[in-house]
């Protein structure tokens, strides 16, 4: 049986470029455990240039092959691609649109679902439409005096707010604000990351995460895990990825009742199915002291770094990551043929 030529595409050039490379390491190691795949790792930089791990400049062509700048190298046909890219252009749905155009099968959510989840405003509209509770918010489409006034009014009403660039991940362009004097500066910074900004009420709550993925034709939601920050603030980019981070993770959140856990999992599956996600996601919730459950956000290509929750929760649920990848990829290619 011939091997599947699998393109492992990573990087992307966004603020999460280096995190993508860390996740790609995990995918590469997992795929190497199977004899089904011939893997070519290619990094995409912020200028749209492709380069193999061996340092060869190349490009992905409309003929679904990797063509090398060194024309003495034979083009490498691509059967399947894993776009291991956090942020733009992976989780935004942009690169998936290209794969659809050239009819190249790929791992993960499709373009529209990715885009809907990555934009925090669109995502919250979907959550509400599906009847899933989420944090109170307003959204802004330009930085002007009216936006500053609206944000200050929200701060006065809610006491504390988060100002977030609507289309960024890993807490990039995200600011906690308690002082009205800082509103204008924070808004200016947030609009520097995205054309739309969302302002949310600060929720004092536990941060719970659920891995939701497809396995043998079923949508699986794990029991919630938990992020615990030593700083007792929100989970910043540095808290997530800095080597000296004091944040810790519990693969199974402690002191969560079976009833609450099942409700969170039900909401997670409802979001996954309702927003037509595919293959994998990590869905994050807040749980308040009054046991109020609020959907926070959906990650359509969750991190797979040494500290990331998704692979740990999948493994804790009894599923092997390599076997999971094999099932998804083979099932998809079989259906295509």
UniProtKB/Swiss-Prot annotation:
Reaction(s) this enzyme catalyzes, per UniProt: 2 D-alanine + ATP = D-alanyl-D-alanine + ADP + phosphate + H(+)
GO BP annotations listed: cell wall organization; peptidoglycan biosynthetic process; regulation of cell shape
Domain ATP-grasp intervals: 124-330
Pathway field: Cell wall biogenesis; peptidoglycan biosynthesis
InterPro entries: ATP-grasp, ATP_grasp_subdomain_1, D-Ala_lig_Van_CS, D_ala_D_ala, Dala_Dala_lig_C, Dala_Dala_lig_N, PreATP-grasp_dom_sf
EC number: 6.3.2.4
Tagged with keyword Cell wall biogenesis/degradation: yes
Cofactor(s) required, per the database record: Mg(2+); Mn(2+)
Residues binding ATP, per UniProt: 154-209
Organism superkingdom: Bacteria
HAMAP family noted in UniProt: Dala_Dala_lig
Role this protein plays: Cell wall formation.
PANTHER family, alphabetized: D-ALANINE--D-ALANINE LIGASE, D-ALANINE--D-ALANINE LIGASE A
Family to which the UniProt record says this protein belongs: Belongs to the D-alanine--D-alanine ligase family.
Protein name (Swiss-Prot/TrEMBL): D-alanine--D-alanine ligase
Species of the source: Shewanella baltica (strain OS185)
């Amino acid at each position: 049986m011939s091997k599947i030529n699998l393109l492992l595409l990573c990087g992307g050039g966004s603020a999460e470029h280096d995190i993508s490379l860390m996740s790609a390491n995990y995918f590469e190691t997992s795929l190497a455990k199977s004899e089904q795949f011939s893997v070519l790792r290619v990094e995409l930089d912020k200028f749209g240039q492709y380069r193999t791990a061996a340092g060869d400049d190349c490009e992905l062509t409309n003929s679904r092959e990797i063509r090398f700048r060194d024309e003495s190298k034979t083009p490498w046909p691509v059967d399947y691609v894993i776009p291991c890219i956090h942020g733009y252009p992976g989780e935004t749905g942009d690169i998936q649109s290209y794969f659809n155009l050239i009819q190249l099968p790929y791992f993960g959510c499709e373009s529209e679902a990715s885009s809907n989840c990555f934009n925090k405003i669109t995502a919250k509209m979907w959550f509400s439409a599906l009847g899933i509770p989420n944090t109170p918010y307003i959204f802004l489409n330009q930085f002007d005096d009216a936006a500053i006034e609206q944000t200050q009014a929200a701060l006065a009403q809610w006491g504390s707010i988060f100002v977030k660039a609507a289309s960024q991940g890993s807490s990039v362009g995200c600011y906690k604000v308690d002082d009205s004097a800082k509103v204008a500066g924070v808004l200016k910074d947030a609009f520097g990351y995205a054309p739309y900004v969302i302002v949310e009420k600060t929720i004092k709550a536990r941060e719970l995460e659920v891995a939701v993925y497809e396995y043998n034709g079923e949508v699986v939601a794990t029991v919630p895990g938990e992020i615990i920050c030593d700083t007792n603030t929100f989970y910043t980019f540095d808290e997530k990825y800095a080597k000296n981070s004091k944040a810790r993770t519990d693969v199974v959140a402690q002191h969560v009742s079976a009833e609450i856990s099942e409700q969170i999992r039900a909401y997670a599956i409802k979001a996954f199915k309702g927003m037509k996600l595919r293959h994998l996601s990590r869905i994050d919730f807040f749980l308040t002291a009054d046991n109020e459950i609020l959907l926070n956000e959906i990650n359509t290509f969750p991190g797979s770094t040494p500290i990331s929750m998704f692979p740990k929760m999948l493994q804790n649920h009894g599923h092997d990551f390599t076997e999971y990848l094999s099932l998804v990829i083979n099932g998809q290619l079989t259906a295509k043929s």
